[in-house]
């Protein structure tokens, strides 16, 4: 398990002081192969620009797969090699929202997509 998964798992179970933090994602979508999808994640309850945001996904019957990370402050990104050229992560500081766009969709992209602080 690499550090990104340790961070993700820690955030998933951390109780107490951060219970006011909310990440609200856009709803489910159905897309055809070759299309693109853009998922939003609106943050609240903390200083948006102070924490990096990860995107992960979980395909049916599979484990979590890390896709990439964005720095909401400067907008810099780092993507998993598997998604290079197909994924774009952006942010809008005025609405405390991050976005993940995945293009050239394939059947194997069927998954639940999550943002994680």
From Swiss-Prot:
Q: Which Cys pairs does UniProt list as disulfide-bonded?
A: 41-115
User: What does the UniProt keyword field contain?
Assistant: Adaptive immunity, Cell membrane, Disulfide bond, Immunity, Immunoglobulin, Immunoglobulin domain, Membrane, Secreted, Signal
- Region of interest (Complementarity-determining-1), ranges: 45-52
Question: Which segments carry the region annotation Complementarity-determining-3?
Answer: 116-117
Q: Where in this chain does the record put each Ig-like domain?
A: 20-117
Q: Which GO terms describe its molecular function?
A: antigen binding
Location, primary (coarse class): secreted
Q: Name one GO biological process term.
A: immunoglobulin mediated immune response
User: Which region ranges are annotated with the description Framework-2?
Assistant: 53-69
What protein am I looking at? Immunoglobulin heavy variable 1-46
